[in-house]
Amino acid sequence: MAFSWQEQIKPAGTQDIQCDIEYLDKSYIHVYLDGAETTGYTWTSATNIRLNTALAASTTVLLIRKTEREYLYIEFASGSPFIEVNVDSQNTQFLHLAQELVEGRAIPGFYGTISMNGYRITDLANPINAQDAATKAYVDTADTLLGQRIDAEHSGWVSAVHAEAVTRKAADDALSMRTSALENTFISGVETVSYPWSAVLTAATDEVTPGLAFTKAVVEINGVGQIRGYSFEIVDNTILFAEVLPAGTVVAARLGADVTAGDGFATQASVDYLANSLGDLAYLDKAAAVSDATSTGDVVAKLNALLAALRTSGVLAT
C-alpha cells in the first residue's frame, strides 16, 4: 500500500475524485491526468476533488503528495507554541517526507520522464515485458544475433542470385545455340525460325495439321524430301499433299523453314535435296540426260531448271 500517491483509471464522465492520501496541506496534493499535471479542479471537502470539466474519455488519474521540504511546517522559533498538536504536525511532516522518499515520489520526474543526470542505472535484470529497460549485455547479445541473421540472409541472397545467374546463363547459352542453329538454316545467313515436327499417320490422308501457325516448311515423307508446289502445299497452317499417303507414313517437317529463298539465295534444305538428287542421278546413270544448270544467273531459277531436268530424266517422279 502506497502512502504518498494513488492511481486509478476513471471512466468518461467522471468529475469527482476521492483522495485517500493523508496530507498536512491541500497544496501538497498534485493531480495528473494521463501523466499531465492539471490545476483545473477544486476541493469540495477534505477528501474530495472536483474537476472543472468531466473526463471526456477513460483516463488514468494520479494523485501525488509532495510535502514541502524546504521549510518546516511548524516553526517553534517563530513563536509556534510547543504543544502536542504542533509536535505531532512537525513529526508528521518528517514522516510524510520519509514516505515520499522511500516510495520514490520525492524524486523529481519519477512519475514522468526520469533524468539520471549522466549517471548509470546498475545491476538491472534482463527485460521481460515490452516496456522494460534493457541492459547493455542484453542489447549486445541481441545485436550479435541480429548481425548473424543479417549475414545469413545476405549469404542466402548471394547464393540465390548466383544460382539464378547460373540458370539464366544456361538458358542464354541454350538460346544462343538455338539462335545460331536457326540462323545457319540458310547458306546466306538469312535468319529464319524453324520448329521440328513429325508424326506417323494412323490413317490414310492427303493432309496433316501440326497445330502450329506457319506459312512455310521443309517436308519429308519417310525420310525423302518433298518440293513445295509439286508434292505439297501449305494452306491455313495445314500441309496438303499431292496424293493420299497411306497409314504408317512418317511425315517430318521443319515448320517455318524456307524451301526457297529467292533473290539469289538458296536454303540449306534446297541444297541438301539437290545433292541427294544428283547422287540419285549418277547412280541411275542418267547424268547425260540432264541439262547443265550452272551459270551466273539466279540460283532459284537455275535450281528450278535443274529440277525440271531431273523430272524429265526420270530421277524425280513428281
From Swiss-Prot:
List the keywords (alphabetical).
Viral tail protein, Virion
Sorted alphabetically, the Gene Ontology cellular component annotations on this record are: virus tail
Enumerate the InterPro entries for this protein.
Phage_T7_tail_fibre-like_N (IPR005604)
Q: Pfam families, per this entry?
A: Phage_T7_tail (PF03906)
Q: Where in the cell is it found?
A: Virion
* Superkingdom classification of source: Viruses
**Main localisation, per the record?**
virion
- Coiled-coil ranges per the record? none
UniProt entry tagged with the keyword NADP:
no
Say what the protein does.
Anchors indirectly the receptor binding (RBP) protein (depolymerase) to the virion.
- For this entry, the protein name equals Anchor protein
Taxonomic path: Viruses, Duplodnaviria, Heunggongvirae, Uroviricota, Caudoviricetes
